[in-house]
Amino acid sequence: MNFNTLLSKLISFKTISMTSNKELMYFIKDYLSKSNINCELLEGSKGQFNLYSRIGPNQDGGILLSGHTDVVPTEGQSWNSNPFKLINKKNRFYGRGTCDMKSFIAVSLDLVSKINISNLKKPIHLIFSYDEEIGCVGIQKIVPFIKKL
């Protein structure tokens, strides 16, 4: 799946703050599994999930790529198109979450699916959380998990 297709799929999930992101997280889990990358889904509240994945060697250190999956509501906003359908106009992407922050998630997923994991000297950690837009609720719930790593 190329970046544009991946981003389009991520934008299509209506992961509005305080609603479930379960379908999106299972999509990401399935996407990573196709590259033989394991991940854990950590259930929070109201059907919302955090996702954690360690890619590469099982050792301390490495780099953490973290992003949130929720978007702010679209009610009361004037959109000229469906905000949950990616529009590409002259290589500019429009859709709810393109800037904050589903493009980052798409880039991260696209890149880790292409790297030669056996060449990594340190791990890459992925953490995708929920409800950042309303107080960083999801990341607060995953901090105790991170401390155990």
Task: Give the ranges of each region predicted by the language model.
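Acidic/histidine-rich catalytic neighborhood of metal-dependent amide-processing enzymes
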Residues: 101-149
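Secondary-structure boundary/capping motif
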Residues: 20, 97, 134-135
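Active-site-proximal loop motif in hydrolases
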Residues: 92-100
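Acidic/His- and Gly-rich active-site-bordering loop/insert found
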Residues: 1-93, 117-120
